[in-house]
């Protein structure tokens, strides 16, 4: 039926707290609801699909003539980070949360890291990425010591000025950290966070790189690759899956590049999965509590969505979702435990349909598996037969 699936993750665009959000300190979080409420941003193209039918949105009205399948999905895994969310979308459950470090990393980890890289480190504490380079950037430039920090997520982040520690050296340092952080200290991701500028004017660049754990079981990506389908990763998708199950990649660094790369891939890849992560919502605006910036990023995606839609054929299935929340209207600058939106469209569809509340993100993996007749996946329930085709 379908020869191609285009799967787009709007990073952090959650649609309301999950029932267990209180366990994560995220009561009341509603990323999309609060951003539309505070800014009044209009999203007519996603509204046409049925975005306003998923939850009440102040500036995106419910659409009785929605053209796609719409609903929301709960995260079944224990977590609210990028790796957990994307792995569940691909069919894996994380039953034990990745370790977090609210007081910084233990001495044995830091000492081993310093020994292996031949440098001391600065920081070693939870911090906002923009704030810690303000605080320690000048000392880093003087000493050449990389800045190590973490957050509420399972991440070991290494910040360095590109003129002090060149990118390839920073990436090598992060690969060493990835080798060290295993067993009980197997954090979800090691992240390179390069920056440039001068004291008082440091700015992070787009040359971020994620070094994820390898998935511990086959994902839908592996199943597709093994059956000879293309799996093309855009944005940080290849990093999130540590290259596993990927046949091609484009490491875009922002939403605009990611959308353009998706459109280009649709011209070139005719059989398989195009899997895109659009990171700006989370990286630039959610974590920085920038409500207006978040709204502008939503508007930008909505404005460019027709470019993707017009390239769809009757052999295509488009799925738009998210991996977690990151509500910029709350005091927290961390991810939030939320439902994520589900928008599913093909030109073959006769009309829109309410896909309801799905119990796991893995329903996407199950649907892709049924579409390409691979699998079945270990988790998830396909919604393919619920679409009015």
Curated annotation (Swiss-Prot):
GO cellular component terms given for this protein: cytosol
Enzyme class: isomerase
GO biological process, one term: metabolic compound salvage
Cofactor note text: Binds 2 manganese ions.
Pfam families: Metalloenzyme
Matches recorded under InterPro entries: Alkaline_phosphatase_core_sf, DeoB, Metalloenzyme, Phosphopentomutase_DeoB_cap_sf
Sites where the protein binds Mn(2+) 2: 282, 287, 335
EC number: 5.4.2.7
Catalytic activity, as annotated: 2-deoxy-alpha-D-ribose 1-phosphate = 2-deoxy-D-ribose 5-phosphate; alpha-D-ribose 1-phosphate = D-ribose 5-phosphate
Cofactor(s), names only, from the UniProt record: Mn(2+)
Chain positions recorded as Mn(2+) 1 binding sites: 11, 323-324
The family this protein is said to belong to: Belongs to the phosphopentomutase family.
Biological role stated in the UniProt entry: Isomerase that catalyzes the conversion of deoxy-ribose 1-phosphate (dRib-1-P) and ribose 1-phosphate (Rib-1-P) to deoxy-ribose 5-phosphate (dRib-5-P) and ribose 5-phosphate (Rib-5-P), respectively.
Protein name: Phosphopentomutase
Protein species of origin: Thermoanaerobacter pseudethanolicus (strain ATCC 33223 / 39E) (Clostridium thermohydrosulfuricum)
Taxon lineage: Bacteria, Bacillati, Bacillota, Clostridia, Thermoanaerobacterales
């Amino acid at each position: 039926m379908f020869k191609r699936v285009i799967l787009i993750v709007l990073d952090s665009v959650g649609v309301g707290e999950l029932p267990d959000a209180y366990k994560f300190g995220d009561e009341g979080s509603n990323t999309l609801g609060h951003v539309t409420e505070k800014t009044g941003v209009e999203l007519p193209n996603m509204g046409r699909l049925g975005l306003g039918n998923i939850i009440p949105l102040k500036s995106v009205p419910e659409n009785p003539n929605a053209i796609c399948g719409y609903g929301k999905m709960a995260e079944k895994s224990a977590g609210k980070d990028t790796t957990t969310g994307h792995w569940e979308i691909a069919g894996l459950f994380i039953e034990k949360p990745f370790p977090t470090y609210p007081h910084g990393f233990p001495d044995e980890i830091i000492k081993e890291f310093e020994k292996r890289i031949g440098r001391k480190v600065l920081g070693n504490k939870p911090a906002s990425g923009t704030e810690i380079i303000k605080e320690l950037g000048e000392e880093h430039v003087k000493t050449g010591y990389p800045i190590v920090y973490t957050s509420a997520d399972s991440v070991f982040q290494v910040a360095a000025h590109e003129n002090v520690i060149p990118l390839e050296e920073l990436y090598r340092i992060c690969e060493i950290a990835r080798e060290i952080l295993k067993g009980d200290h197997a954090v979800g991701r090691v992240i390179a966070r390069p920056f440039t500028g001068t004291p008082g004017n440091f700015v992070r660049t787009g040359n971020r790189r994620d070094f994820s754990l390898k998935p511990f079981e086959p994902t839908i990506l592996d199943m597709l690759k093994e059956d000879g389908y293309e799996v093309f990763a855009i944005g940080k998708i290849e990093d999130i899956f540590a290259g596993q199950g990927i046949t091609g990649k484009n490491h875009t660094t922002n939403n605009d590049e990611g959308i353009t790369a998706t459109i280009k891939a649709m011209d070139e890849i005719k059989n398989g999965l195009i899997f895109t992560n659009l990171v700006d919502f989370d990286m630039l605006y959610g974590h920085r509590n920038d409500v207006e910036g978040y709204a502008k990023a939503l508007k930008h995606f909505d404005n460019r969505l027709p470019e993707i839609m017009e390239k769809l054929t009757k052999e295509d299935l488009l799925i738009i979702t998210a991996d977690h929340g990151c509500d910029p209207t709350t005091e927290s600058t961390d991810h939030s435990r939320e439902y994520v939106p589900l928008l599913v469209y093909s030109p073959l569809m006769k009309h829109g349909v309410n896909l309801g509340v799905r119990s796991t993100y893995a329903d996407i993996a199950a649907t892709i598996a049924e579409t390409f007749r691979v699998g079945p996946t270990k988790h998830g329930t396909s919604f393919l037969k619920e679409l009015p085709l």
